[in-house]
């Protein structure tokens, strides 16, 4: 069993982590994946930015970049927070991997957001879909008779070369990947002229990802944790170990989880539309978990995934299993 090297003595009690290209990423951000109420994401961003957040995580697939752009426009208009104060991440969807589509869709994202450039742009998944429009003017994939996306013969290498062009063009500051396993990364690093700065994956106490982190640390690829609370599908808030640790520090279970990630050097991007919870989630910089408590959380690993590409795409894409 892999033993992590992160402990109470490691100085990860700060707001930012340095990336391998010299840029910095805020260690906790706001996720924007879906909202039943279109206005919710705008309100959440406004609330988050006014309460200390400077990291917003989005994606073209989420379908809300124009709404987010309108919200940011109003926030910037107030004058207290400027574009350069914010670290914005977006992602290239699977149906836009072709070399003639990458720049086009990055530009569309930037225009929808109205922010001039992206701080970080990720390949959302290491799988390409056929685009339903010959000109690639949509992210909607071409589907088979069962409604499942049709896989496109596009290599990650082809897509990554276009991602590198985005940096050269000044459209993005940093580039990275999401949902990549070690084999994907090994291959990518054989030809990448610009090394990915980030690999955004699902990480939480029931899916600790230590082996993946060991590899990423070796090549200075920072992990970012999506679904750090398990999308509400995990019983973290009733877990006796997590509740006991939270009580010890007089913090919430969520705070303990985010702090555990922080002390491992992993950025977290929890999603919430609740005003008080957004504020509470950010409140992790005034305490430090002991080595013993970190090991207790580490012991909870059960390799439970709440976001599986097999069920997500209806395609036999065994990325992790």
UniProtKB/Swiss-Prot annotation:
Q: Which reaction does it catalyse?
A: an alditol + NAD(+) = an aldose + NADH + H(+); an alditol + NADP(+) = an aldose + NADPH + H(+)
Residue positions binding NADP(+): 22-31, 227-281
User: GO CC: one term?
Assistant: cytosol
Query: One Pfam match, by short name?
Result: Aldo_ket_red
Keyword set for this entry? NADP, Oxidoreductase
* Superkingdom of source: Eukaryota
Main EC class the enzyme belongs to? oxidoreductase
Enzyme active site: 62 (proton donor)
Can you name one GO molecular function term for this protein?
Answer: glyceraldehyde oxidoreductase activity
Report the record's disulfide bonds.
Answer: none
Q: Which EC numbers characterise this protein's activity in its record? A: 1.1.1.21
Q: Name one GO biological process term.
A: carbohydrate derivative metabolic process
Annotated residues that bind substrate are located at: 124
Please explain the role this protein plays, according to its UniProt record.
Catalyzes the NADPH-dependent reduction of a wide variety of carbonyl-containing compounds to their corresponding alcohols with a broad range of catalytic efficiencies.
Family stated for the protein in its record: Belongs to the aldo/keto reductase family.
What's the protein called, per UniProt? Aldose reductase C
What is the scientific name of the source organism? Answer: Dictyostelium discoideum
Q: Provide the taxonomic classification.
A: Eukaryota, Amoebozoa, Evosea, Eumycetozoa, Dictyostelia
Query: What gene makes this protein?
Result: alrC
